[in-house]
Design a protein with these regions (language model features):
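RNA-binding accessory domains that recognize and position tRNA/RNA substrates
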Residues: 1-147, 160-164
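Catalytic nucleophile serine of serine hydrolases
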Residues: 150-151
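Hydrophobic/small residue at the entry helix of a nucleotide-binding pocket
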Residues: 155-156
């Protein structure tokens, strides 16, 4: 079993792995050639094309989700899990407001443990990169009246049918 320590950074130039006594440390570059990495640039552009401009906090949430997704899809349970299932993952994440996020650590860790069965830890550090909002949002149009998450499972199918 290996503990993973994933360090996201906007000043990291390339993906680097380092094995220590108690963990595998991975430096994860959030920028590639000056653009957001791991699909975040595409998401940013797609949102902007729909006149949606996330705040710095909204961008923090997108980055958190991206790092959780990377960890979940790249760290094999069979190889790195304590019981061939439970993994131990710590994520160091640059955010816009460290104090705000530190108040949410327990909630985020418990939520992810419930959803994945893994042991999660978070360290929030000050983000040294700004999610620029050069354009001004125009008047929003009411294209949608509500949203529903749909995973394809029976419970979300029933919920979606009830909305129709």
């Amino acid at each position: 079993m290996s503990k993973y320590y994933l360090k996201a950074g906007y000043d990291i130039e390339s993906l680097k792995f380092c094995k220590t006594e108690d963990a595998i440390v991975v430096d994860i570059p959030m920028l590639l050639h000056g653009k957001l990495n791991y699909g975040l640039e595409h998401v940013k552009n797609l949102l902007r094309s729909h006149n949606i401009f996330p705040s710095e906090l909204g961008f923090d949430i997108l980055t958190l989700a991206t790092m959780v997704y990377l960890a979940d899809t790249r760290i094999a349970r069979l190889i790195h899990g304590q019981d061939s299932w439970t993994r131990e993952i710590v994520i160091q994440l640059p955010v816009s407001d460290v104090d705000l996020w530190n108040k949410q650590i327990t909630t985020v860790e418990r939520m992810l443990k419930f959803l994945t069965g893994d042991l999660w830890g978070f360290e929030f550090v000050k983000r040294n990169w700004s999610f620029e909002q050069n354009e001004k949002a125009e008047e929003k149009t009411a294209l949608y009246s509500r949203a529903s998450l749909f995973s394809g499972g029976m419970d979300s199918l029933i919920s979606t049918i009830n909305l129709m």
